[in-house]
Amino acid sequence: MAKLSVSDSPERRTGFGRANARERSINQRKLRVLLAEKMHLIAADLAFELEQEGLEVTAISHTLAETMQLIAHKPIDLALMNVEFSDGKSYPAARRLKDAGIPFAFFTTFTQDEIAEDFRTAPCLRKPQDTHRIAAAVKDLARRARRDPEIP
């Protein structure tokens, strides 16, 4: 699975102390979730469910371009992304997340085999899916992020 961390702190820019600073930060607050979903109604429903599970949806995007901007400028701890947007597939965003060290999962109609080879080990939640089950899976990813900020 790919990882993402977005921060302007010196620890994040240099890599020094990144795990310890991130672990302290994550354990002291709600996890900030980026939700990247092209369908507005699905995104709103899923955001509601994630917040009911105690996560903070700090950003919602509906295109690849918006997703890339949010990754670059918004602090997030994990992401849930559709694979396909109107302006392209989410793989450039997945690459940024992976390189930055923040966990993510795909939420898509794609099968694991249809996902680009570089990202086949990332968690893949298949659509259609009950939003309660999706929220529970993201909460599990969040628990893993809290325990180990360097999870693959």
Where are these regions (language model features)?
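Non-catalytic signal-transmission and effector/linker regions of two-component phosphorelay proteins
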Residues: M1-R32, D130-P152
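Short hydrophobic helical patches associated with two-component signaling proteins
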Residues: D45-L50, I134
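Alpha-helical interaction/dimerization surfaces of two-component signaling modules
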Residues: F48-E53, L70, R96
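Conserved phosphotransfer microenvironments
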Residues: M81-K98
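Alpha4 helix (beta4-alpha4-beta5 surface) of REC/receiver domains from two-component response regulators
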Residues: P92, D99, F110-K127, H132, ...
